[in-house]
């Protein structure tokens, strides 16, 4: 989503010739027909020769773009290559024989410290480095001894669309939430590495200590079912069924709404029909 917004903005300026290399797009992908910039799909097409498909599957990092990167460089001849993703998805760019011919701007995910030394070394080789937070920038500067060419943080929340709404009372009322309730929120996918059990345990301890536990709610913008935790089981384990809100989306109207957990699918308040899914 973040990369898409950046591409749309850059394209709107009419200042740049833009190309997108899509890791999970196919060569000659029909979904790219309406994209207003040059598009390169990394995956072999469905009718590609079997030896090409086997070659693509032979190296794990090929799926992140390494499979097509040299071909794209030869065809597009980029002046700047931008990578907004994790280390293991971008490190092949450092090894490219065409690396001296373009500037490399990266925005790696830095959400823990210390970072691996190999990661820091790769980040140092980039011509420019951005982060999602000032804290992450501090981690990179400290570990590299100031050698990383750090430009600053550029989070998606810098966009005006994410500007905090000052009238929180009206906002809560619009979502049918008690405006007097204080909300603690989190946005993270339901994966095993995301510590939902610890979060629910900590929130339960918090509720047990405050004077009026009904003054607080936890809001989770997450997914279920997914590859991670059994959300309803955790809610029962920590007796939080009445204290945790989730984002559901009505598939017919595309409108989001907040609700206590009602399963993976619940009735939409907009249509009265079942089909609203946990975001």
For the regions a language model picked out, list residue spans one by one.
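Extended catalytic core of nucleotide-activated donor transferases of GT-like folds
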Residues: 34-128, 134-135
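Short beta-strand->alpha-helix junction loop in the catalytic core
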Residues: 25, 135, 150-166, 251
């Amino acid at each position: 989503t973040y990369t898409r917004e950046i591409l749309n903005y850059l394209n709107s300026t009419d200042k740049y010739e833009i190309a997108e290399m899509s890791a999970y797009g196919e060569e000659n992908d029909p979904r790219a027909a309406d994209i207003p910039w040059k598009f390169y799909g990394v995956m072999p097409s469905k009718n590609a020769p079997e030896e090409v498909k086997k070659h693509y599957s032979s190296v794990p990092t090929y799926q992140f773009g390494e499979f097509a990167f040299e071909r794209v460089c030869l065809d597009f001849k980029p002046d700047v290559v931008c990578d907004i993703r994790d280390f293991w998805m971008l490190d092949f760019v450092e090894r490219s024989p065409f690396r001296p011919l373009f500037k490399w701007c990266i925005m790696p995910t830095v959400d823990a410290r210390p970072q691996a030394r190999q990661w820091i070394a790769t980040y140092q080789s980039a011509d420019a480095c951005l982060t999602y937070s000032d804290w992450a920038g501090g981690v990179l500067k400290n570990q590299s001894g100031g050698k990383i060419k750090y430009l600053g943080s550029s989070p998606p929340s810098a966009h005006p669309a994410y500007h905090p709404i000052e009238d929180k009372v009206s906002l809560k009322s619009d979502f049918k939430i008690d405006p007097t309730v204080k909300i603690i929120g989190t946005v993270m996918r339901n994966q095993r590495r995301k510590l939902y059990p610890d979060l629910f345990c900590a929130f339960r301890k918090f509720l047990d200590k405050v004077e009026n536990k009904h003054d607080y709610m936890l809001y989770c913008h997450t997914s279920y079912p997914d590859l991670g935790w059994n959300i309803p089981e955790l809610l029962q384990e920590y007796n939080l069924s009445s204290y945790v809100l989730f984002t559901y989306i009505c598939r017919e109207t595309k409108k989001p709404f907040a609700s206590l957990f009602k399963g993976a699918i619940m009735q939409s308040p907009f249509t009265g029909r079942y089909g609203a899914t946990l975001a």
